[in-house]
Swiss-Prot record:
Pfam families: CobS
Gene transcribed to yield this protein: cobS
Organism (species): Nitratidesulfovibrio vulgaris (strain DP4) (Desulfovibrio vulgaris)
UniProt-recorded name of the protein: Adenosylcobinamide-GDP ribazoletransferase
UniProt membrane topology term: Multi-pass membrane protein
Cross-referenced HAMAP family: CobS
Length: 245
């Protein structure tokens, strides 16, 4: 199998359940980071196709709920675990080792629940408006932009001392990966939303990445939870910005 195809399949297998997971070395995982936008395309296509075929047509509220459900199933809820963990750690106002203890705790607390409710609510509202407007292409754009933003975040902050996934992702967030992520994100937004909406979306996603990078630097680095929160947050930003544009 060609090396590029192995890395592409590795990215899709890691970020979705639609491609079988593969055994990989640390170098392979780092090389797969360049293919994160492709994994976003796979997720977006899987979320878009049922509705393009008419699933729950004329019932946008039901479609929006199903969209959130399909997105969760396709990704195994991987990124939302990061949302909950990071919300608990940040909401506790803890710093240093205590911050990381909470972040790594598999149990969910009150702030984690609130973070999930806000995140799911934002996705649902944005998707509902998208279904009303009929601009289904945004459903494909959102996951691509989210995973591209994750690559940029990984390039901005080094991994934390207690990070495993973060270390592998940061190692692969080189100039080529950043260029691919930014180019794919901007192009797909321009293809699916008006120019001003694209500008607004980039600004919001930039603010999310900046805020997460600031928090990560304060706490000594990033891990997979930061990246998951970045993906989920930027996906929601695309949907909400497009619904208002």
């Amino acid at each position: 199998m060609p090396t590029f195809l192995h890395h592409a399949l590795l990215a899709c297998g890691f970020l979705t359940r639609l491609v079988p997971a593969r055994v990989a070395t640390a170098d392979d995982m780092a090389a797969a980071v360049r293919w994160f936008p492709l994994a976003g395309l796979v997720v977006g296509g899987a979320c878009w196709l049922p509705f393009a075929l008419g699933l729950a047509a004329s019932h946008p509220a039901i479609q929006a709920w199903l969209y959130v459900l399909i997105n969760l199933w396709v990704t195994r809820g991987l990124h939302w675990d990061g949302v909950a963990d990071l919300a608990d750690a940040w909401g506790s106002s803890a710093t240093g080792e205590r911050f990381w203890d909470i972040l790594k705790d598999s149990r969910i607390g009150a702030f984690g629940v609130m973070g999930l409710l806000l995140g799911f609510g934002g996705q649902y509202i944005g998707a509902h408006e998208i279904f009303i407007s009929g601009r289904l292409g945004v459903l494909i754009a959102a996951p691509i932009v989210g995973r591209g933003a994750c690559v940029i975040l990984a390039a901005l902050v080094p991994p934390g001392s207690r990070s495993t996934l973060g270390r592998l992702t940061c190692a692969g967030a080189d100039r080529i990966a950043i260029g691919v992520a930014a180019t794919c994100g901007i192009l797909v937004l321009l293809l699916t939303t008006p120019v001003m909406t694209t500008v607004t979306t980039i600004a919001i996603c930039g603010a999310i990445v900046t805020a997460l990078a600031h928090l990560a630097r304060r706490e000594g680095g990033i891990n997979g939870d930061f990246m998951g929160a970045c993906i989920a947050g930027c996906e929601g930003a695309v949907l909400l910005a497009a619904s208002m544009g």
